[in-house]
């Protein structure tokens, strides 16, 4: 690919990165898609679709494939990073030497930093410096529906108001099929995407056990309370968690089997082991690592998160899923409102 002036460079050619690239390109924006595996990029270029994840969605003509990172980053000042959270920092450090002087970074990665549990904004600042504008996309988005052009809405938060406006009114203005809501709460929009992964595993476990819709709904509601408590402790606006990046994403991933986290939880509830369930999914289950990271973050903040604690016990301490659920049901009585 010769150097071009693109509206956006997308880093990460998995299902979600490809779906976002298709969505932007379909709506008239020039988009460059880069992936870490040159052979994969060559295959995508040959097939003009992502056979592995989105085989029924052809690439628009304005979606360009690039295997050379330097050329991909030279094509646009705006860079959308869509990679798993446990490699987020490594990828940003890989990008830094090749970024344009006027570069701006937005990510659609959901989660916290592996091992440390830090918000991704802190990882980005450490990797890229204090001056580069940053933004985050988060909300209820399944890759297959997004790529198919089905109506989707998402939240956008940025460190720079002009950057947020440029994205919302510019390359992320995609007609009626993809609606972007701006939100000034940079912390809350990031956090919602991490905590919902954990609660989705719990919802799947509940359904795998066979506890039914009542239990699932109670778990979602109390999971939202945990999300809000942790967010408030970190300085987020609690109202953010009633929006796309909170309740919206939480309901989606807890109730639909397109969610890898939910399917993973269902298998655990049915008695499968953690490794067996992960192998069956065949893709990254973000909630597995997120559970450890979210719990550690909550403990540092002194925030009680009993659902997250029990999911951690199942994932890392070999506790039976049914026993974990019964532990939650057996907790001391509490008033609902003060704990929210």
UniProtKB/Swiss-Prot annotation:
GO terms in the biological process aspect are: carbohydrate metabolic process; glycerol-3-phosphate biosynthetic process; glycerol-3-phosphate catabolic process; glycerophospholipid biosynthetic process
List of residues binding sn-glycerol 3-phosphate:
110, 139, 141, 196, 249, 259-261
SUPFAM superfamilies (alphabetical): 6-phosphogluconate dehydrogenase C-terminal domain-like, NAD(P)-binding Rossmann-fold domains
Q: Which domain of life is it from?
A: Bacteria
**EC numbers on record:** 1.1.1.94
Catalyzed reactions: sn-glycerol 3-phosphate + NAD(+) = dihydroxyacetone phosphate + NADH + H(+); sn-glycerol 3-phosphate + NADP(+) = dihydroxyacetone phosphate + NADPH + H(+)
Compartments annotated for it: namely: Cytoplasm
What's this protein's family per the entry? Belongs to the NAD-dependent glycerol-3-phosphate dehydrogenase family.
- HAMAP family the UniProt entry points to: NAD_Glyc3P_dehydrog
Under PANTHER family, the record lists: GLYCEROL-3-PHOSPHATE DEHYDROGENASE, GLYCEROL-3-PHOSPHATE DEHYDROGENASE [NAD(+)] 2, CHLOROPLASTIC
Annotated protein name in UniProt: Glycerol-3-phosphate dehydrogenase [NAD(P)+]
Species name: Serratia marcescens
């Amino acid at each position: 690919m010769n150097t071009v002036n693109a509206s956006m460079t997308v880093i990460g050619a998995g299902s979600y990165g490809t779906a976002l690239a298709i969505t932007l390109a379909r709506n008239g924006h020039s988009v460059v898609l880069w992936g870490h595996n040159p052979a994969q990029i060559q295959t995508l270029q040959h097939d003009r679709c992502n056979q592995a994840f989105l085989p029924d969605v052809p690439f628009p003509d304005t979606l360009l494939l690039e295997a050379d990172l330097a050329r991909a980053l030279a094509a646009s000042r705006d860079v959308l990073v869509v990679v798993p959270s446990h490699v987020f920092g490594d990828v940003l450090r890989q990008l830094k030497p090749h970024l344009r002087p006027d570069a701006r970074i937005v990510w659609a990665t959901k989660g916290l930093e592996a091992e440390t549990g830090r918000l991704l904004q802190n990882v980005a600042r450490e990797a890229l410096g204090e001056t580069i504008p940053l933004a985050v996309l988060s909300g209820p988005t399944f890759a297959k529906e997004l790529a198919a052009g089905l109506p989707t809405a998402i939240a956008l938060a940025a460190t720079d108001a002009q950057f947020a406006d440029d994205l919302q009114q510019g390359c992320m203005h995609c007609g009626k099929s993809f609606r972007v809501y701006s939100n000034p709460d940079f912390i809350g929009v990031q956090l919602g995407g991490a905590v919902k992964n954990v609660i989705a595993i719990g919802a799947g476990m509940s359904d795998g056990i066979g506890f039914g819709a009542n239990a699932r709904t109670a778990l979602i509601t109390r999971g939202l309370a945990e999300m809000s408590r942790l967010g408030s402790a970190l300085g987020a606006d609690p109202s953010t968690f009633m929006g796309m990046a909170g309740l919206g994403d939480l309901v989606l991933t807890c109730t639909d089997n397109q969610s890898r986290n939910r399917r993973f939880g269902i298998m655990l509830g049915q008695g499968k082991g953690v490794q067996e369930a992960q192998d069956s999914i065949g893709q990254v289950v973000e909630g597995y690592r997120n559970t450890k990271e979210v719990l550690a973050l909550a403990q540092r903040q002194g925030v009680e998160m009993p659902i997250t604690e029990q999911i951690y016990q199942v994932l890392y301490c070999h506790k039976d899923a049914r026993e974990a659920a019964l532990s939650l049901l057996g907790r001391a009585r509490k008033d609902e409102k003060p704990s929210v």
